[in-house]
Amino acid sequence: MITVTPGELATIDDALTDLLLERVFYWAEVRKASVHYKPLRGISDRHIHDLVRSIAACETGAAANLAVKKATNAFLELKEVRGYRGRLSPLAYEEFQRHTVRYLTIYKASCGFEINVSMRYKCRSNRGESCVISRVRYNRGDEIVGLSGCLAKMTKDEELALANDFSVLHSSRRGGNCLMLGPARFVNHDCSANARFVPVPSGMVIQAVKPINVGDEITVKYAENYFGRRNKECLCQTCEENSRGLYGSPQESSEEESDDDMDELTKIELQRRKKRQEQREGGTPELREGGRGSSESSRETSEEAIEISTSKNWPLIPKIESHTADSTPLPVPVGEVSEATVTEVSTVVPAQEAIPVNESTTALSQSSNEFQDPTIDPILNGASAEIRFPSLPSPDTTTSPESQVPPFIQPKSARRNHHYLGMHNTDERVRFNDRLSVLDERGGSEDMESCLVSGSESRDDSTAMSRDEESSRDDGDGSRSKRSKRHVRAQRKNSGSWSFSQEDLSFDRLCKAAREQAYDPSRYALTGVYGFSVSGATQTCVSCCSVYNLTDGPKTLGHFCPRCHRHAAIHSFAWPYTNHKHALPLCLLMMRPPKKLEDEDWGLSKPQVAQQFGAKNRKIFEEDGSLVQKKRKSLAWSWEYTKEEPAQEITSMRIEDMSPKELKKWSQAGRQTRSGRVSMLPEKPKRSRKSAPEPVEMRDNVAQLSREERAWKRARRGTVGHEKVEVNTPTVETPSTGTPKVKKLHWKQKLAMERRQKEAEAAEVAETRVADGVDASTPSPAGSTPTPRGRGRPRKSSREEEIPPEKTPEAKRPSPAATKTPSMSPKVKKEPLSMSFSMSPTSRSGRVRNPTEKALQLMEQGEYVI
C-alpha cells in the first residue's frame, strides 16, 4: 500500500492536532512531530466547537457516522483549510481526509476513551504529556474502536533528519522503522501494558490484552530496549512499583552499563563485588538496628563492609571497616561533591560511646592519614575526609536510621528522594532545601517543636547550648525576622543537627501544602495538581474528586477540574458519561458546591420525562417546588436545590450558545451581566400536565357557538338588507370530549364563498319579485337601503320595521315581457363599470369609501341621473 512520506504525515498530523485537539477546550500543549510547524491563522474556535458538538450530540451509530461525514466536509470547506490543502499533493490530500476522520471520531458519544494530560513525565520534558484514558470498561480481546493511527516507513536519512523520535516504531511487515501518527500516538509505554498494537492494512489499531476499567490509562509496550538497555531509563508505573528502570538503585544501573566502557579487570572486580554483596545481604537488617542505638548488634556488624559503587551518576558510597569493636568506623572520602547539596551523616557507633558529630569529624580528619586503607580504589585518594551524599534535608536527618544507611539499601521512598535531587542542578536544590527543610509531615507548630528537641542519645547538651548562644548572639543586633537566609543555610550545613527560629516555624504553616504538592516522580497525577504552588491554592473537583491547582493551573469554571470541564463542554454530561441513559445528577458550571439530596428529593430522569410529559418538555416542577430540572444549551441536564424560590426558573444560559433569535428575545426581557450571562428572564405560567376541558359558559340558556359555527357566521355577514337567508351548514358530529378542530379557511376561499352566496341571494330575490309581479329591473323605493357587499351586518330600515309585510300595497301588474317564468328568464349578472371603481371586498362596514363609488352605485340603481 502506497502511503505518504514521514515528512508529509508529520505536517498533516501537526495541523490536525492543533485544530481538532488543542482548540477543543484542551488545557495543555501537544508536542509536534515537525520542528518547523506554523499554525493556521484565521480559523475561529467557535467553528471547531460547533463541528465537534454536532458529532457529540448524536447517540446512535448511524447518526454519528453521518455527523462525522458532514463535519469532515464542513471542515475541509473552511477558507483557511482550502488554502492549506491546496499545497498538498493528491496522495497527501487523501491522507489528510482520512486523518481528519480519525481525529473527529474520538468525539463520538460511543467512543470509549479520551485524550488527557499526564504529569508522570514532567521531569523529562518539563511539561505535561498527553495520555489516553478509558471512559468505559474493556475486556480482554476487545478492540478499542477509534484509537488508530497511520504508519509511514522511514529511510535512514529521514531517521536522522527527524528531530522528535517519540513515535517511531519498528514494523516487521514494512521492513524497517516507521513513523506512527494519529490518535494512537498518545498511548504511552508501560512494561506491563494492558493493550497491544495490531497492524491492519489501513494502519494500526490497539487491542486490549487485560481488563481495562473506567479511568485507567491505556498503555502498550513499545519494545524491550526502547528506553536504553533493559529500559533502564523507563518511568512507567510498573518500573516504579518494582523499583526498576529510572526508579532502580544506582548499583543496578551501574552494573547494566555497556561492556565497551570498561576493561576486563573492571568486569572481574564488579563480578567479585556483586558476589560478596549477595553474601552479605543478611547483615543489612542488623546494620539498620545498630543505627538505632543497639550496642550488641553494632559490635556484631562492625566487621562487615559495604562495597563501593562505581556508578558514574551517583557519589561513591564509603566502605566501612572497624579494626576493633570499640573503635569508631573510619569515613572514606567521596570525591568532589558540592557543599550546598549534601548533608553530613554520622557513622554507626554504639550509643554509650556516641560523640557529637562536629567533634567526631574533627578528630577523624586529624587521623585520616593513619587509617588509610591501601586496598581502597585509588580514585578516592586526595579527597576531603568527610562523608557526604545527597539526601532530602529533613529534621529527622540525625535521628532517622534511614539517613545513616546507603541509598541502595534504603526503602523505595528514600531512593525516590535521592533520585529527585540528583536530577536537578545545585541552585534549584538549594532553594528547594531551604523551603522544605523546616516542614514536617505531621504539621503544626507544636508537633514541629516537639520533633526538633533531640534527646541525649543523639546530641550532647553542651553542643546544643553553645549553638543556642551563637544564635542569640547573632540576633542581638536585630530582630529574629531580619536574620538572613544565608546564615541559616550555613548553620545547617556546618552543624550536625538542625536549629529553627520562630520565622521557620511560621513558614511551616505556609509551606505545608507546598510539601504535599511537591513533584515526586513516583506521584502519578492524571488530572491532579497541575504545577507547583507554594501558596497551596488547590481545589477538589466535585465531579471526579481530583485535586487541581487554581493559581498555577489552567483557568476553569466553578469547582471542576480541566478534564471534567472539557468533557462537559463537549458532551454536556458529567465525566465519564456521554448520554442520558445514565441517570447521573449534574452540577456543572455552578458557582457553589452541590448539596446532598435525599432519595425522595430526586426528580425524574430524561426518559421518564419523555414518556410521561412528551419529548418536548424540558423542565419538571415538583409539587412542593423544591427541585427544578432544566435544560441548558452549554450543559444539558443539571440539578439545583431551590427551596427559597421554588417557582422561579433558574437561568444560566451562556450568550455565545444562543441563537440570534433567542438572543434577541432574551435581550429584550433581561439584562446582560459582567459574567456574560442573561438574567431576569420572564416567568412562564405553570401549566398542568393533563388539562381538563373547560366548562361551557351559558348565556341565556344558549350555549356558545363553536369555532366552526363562528366561521360560518362570519361568512354569512354580507347578506341582503333585512332578509335573513338560511345557509345549510354541513353538520359535523362533535365528540363529547372537547372542542373539534376546524380547518381554517383561506382568505381567497372566504371571498369565493361570499361571492357564491351573494349570487344565490340575488337570484332568489329576483324570483321572488317576479312571482309577486314586481319587475326586477325597476329601481327600488327611495327609502330602501342598497345591498352592501362588505362583511358588516345589514341594517334594517325604520320603514320596514313600521310596516309589516302583509300590509304592503300590491304591486302593479307586470308587463307581458316580464311575466316569463323563472326557468325561461336568463340570469344576468351585473358587472361594475370599472374594476378600479368597484367596491372593495375588504370593506367590513358595508359603506362606500369615496363619492365616486357612491355615484356609480346610485347610477346602477337608477336613482342618480346625469
From Swiss-Prot:
GO terms for cellular component: chromosome; nucleus. Residues 253-263 have a biased composition (Acidic residues). GO terms for biological process: methylation. Residues 278-302, 457-480, 696-712, 751-772, 797-813 have a biased composition (Basic and acidic residues). Residues 359-372, 728-739 have a biased composition (Polar residues). This is Histone-lysine N-methyltransferase SET9. It comes from Yarrowia lipolytica (strain CLIB 122 / E 150) (Yeast). Its EC number is 2.1.1.372. The keyword Calcium does not apply. Histone methyltransferase that trimethylates 'Lys-20' of histone H4 to form H4K20me3. It is found in: Nucleus; Chromosome. The keyword Nucleus applies. Belongs to the class V-like SAM-binding methyltransferase superfamily. Histone-lysine methyltransferase family. Suvar4-20 subfamily. Residues 390-403, 776-789, 834-845 have a biased composition (Low complexity). Residues 111-223 form the SET domain. It catalyses: L-lysyl(20)-[histone H4] + 3 S-adenosyl-L-methionine = N(6),N(6),N(6)-trimethyl-L-lysyl(20)-[histone H4] + 3 S-adenosyl-L-homocysteine + 3 H(+). Residues 243-310, 359-378, 383-416, 443-495, 661-853 are annotated as: Disordered. Residues 481-492 have a biased composition (Basic residues). GO terms for molecular function: histone H4K20 methyltransferase activity; histone H4K20 trimethyltransferase activity. The gene is SET9. Keywords: Chromatin regulator, Chromosome, Methyltransferase, Nucleus, S-adenosyl-L-methionine, Transferase.
